[in-house]
C-alpha cells in the first residue's frame, strides 16, 4: 500500500505505474466516488498518448478510445451499467485484442473477465490524501 499525499504524488505514482503496463493488460480501478479513479486513468493515458492529449471522462458515454502507435487504450466507466452484458455492446470483445483496457467501477463485470487482472484500489484519507494498493493475480503488484 502506498500513501499519496498530494495530487502531484498521485500523478507521479500513476505515471510510474503506467510504465509497467503493456497491451492485453486489464486494469480495474476501484474506489468511492471522488477517490481519483479518472485522475489516475488520465495519467496512464497521457503516458502512452502524450501529455497534451485531450482526455475526456467516459462517465456519460461509458467508453473513450485513445490511439497509441502500437495499440489502443479502451477507457470504460461502468458506473451507469445496469447489466454486465451491456459491456459487449461497447466493443469489449474488440478491446481484448491486443489493447490496454482501463475499467472504472468494474465490480459489475469483474466476474466476466479472465485473469490476470490488475486491480488499483484507491481510498480517500483525510486532507486529500489517497491510499493506493495495486494487486495482480492475488499478489501485490509492487514496482517501487
From Swiss-Prot:
Entry annotated with the keyword DNA repair: no
Disulfide partners: none
Positions contributing to ATP binding: 34-39
Organism: Rickettsia prowazekii (strain Madrid E)
PANTHER family reported for this sequence: TRNA THREONYLCARBAMOYLADENOSINE BIOSYNTHESIS PROTEIN TSAE (PTHR33540:SF2)
GO molecular function, one term: ATP binding
Role description: Required for the formation of a threonylcarbamoyl group on adenosine at position 37 (t(6)A37) in tRNAs that read codons beginning with adenine. Is involved in the transfer of the threonylcarbamoyl moiety of threonylcarbamoyl-AMP (TC-AMP) to the N6 group of A37, together with TsaD and TsaB. TsaE seems to play an indirect role in the t(6)A biosynthesis pathway, possibly in regulating the core enzymatic function of TsaD.
Top-level taxonomy: Bacteria, Pseudomonadati, Pseudomonadota, Alphaproteobacteria, Rickettsiales
Recorded family membership: Belongs to the TsaE family.
Name by which UniProt lists this protein: tRNA threonylcarbamoyladenosine biosynthesis protein TsaE
One Gene Ontology biological process: tRNA threonylcarbamoyladenosine modification
GO cellular component: cytoplasm
Keywords of the record: ATP-binding, Cytoplasm, Magnesium, Metal-binding, Nucleotide-binding, tRNA processing
Cellular location(s): Cytoplasm
